[in-house]
């Protein structure tokens, strides 16, 4: 073996040994790998992150609903301003009415707050948005009180939901065989939740009649614990019901003009002018 070949082998061996030494030293000096997330604190942190993601998704859905409400209200006010004589026999909508303007302002402020929650990039921004939404001095509080009272009102919510619930078994019996498995399961879940909502209404005492205008302009009266619990249960059930999309048109009729079903199976405004016209006809 020549001296040159021997030297090459020696150099290569030294390089390999140096690399192995560097690797070994690196394993000793490297930052330790993080431990598995098994402690209670880490589990709480993980759950908080999941809760924030869920809340942000809900805020985005809520913001979409508010945008539709604002669009419809603006279209109605624009239409009333352009042709105040239209809709004779009904209470005309005054585009300069202080209460209507206050409602629009509250809706837009509520949209801004929900946007802060939905688009928060860190936990601090997320909590700040939530604090703004639930502040007792929030200008949206009267509007939110109106929504809460309306949702909890047996007179407003119960009759149409009860009618759908009562007619659902016959619909499933007549049409169940022709539905795909996913749609049939969704309708069955919808029927189940509707039953829970109706039961909740039926076991509650009669609630005071809701006056939307008064509720939107005055602080809500102090609610008793039973009413608060009633609303919380209804709120959760209504959110769950929404997850199963629009009921069969055979039970509720086709969507009004100007509306269409979105990718999640829920109704949304597609044409504000047509939707406003449909609302005025109902």
UniProtKB/Swiss-Prot annotation:
Subcellular location: Peroxisome
Pfam families: Pex19
Highest taxon of the lineage: Eukaryota
Gene Ontology molecular function: any one: peroxisome membrane targeting sequence binding
Region (Disordered): 73-95
Transmembrane segments: none
Residues bearing a lipid moiety (S-farnesyl cysteine): 279
Gene Ontology biological process terms in this record: nematode larval development; protein import into peroxisome membrane
Residues bearing the modification Cysteine methyl ester: 279
Record family assignment: Belongs to the peroxin-19 family.
Protein name: Putative peroxisomal biogenesis factor 19
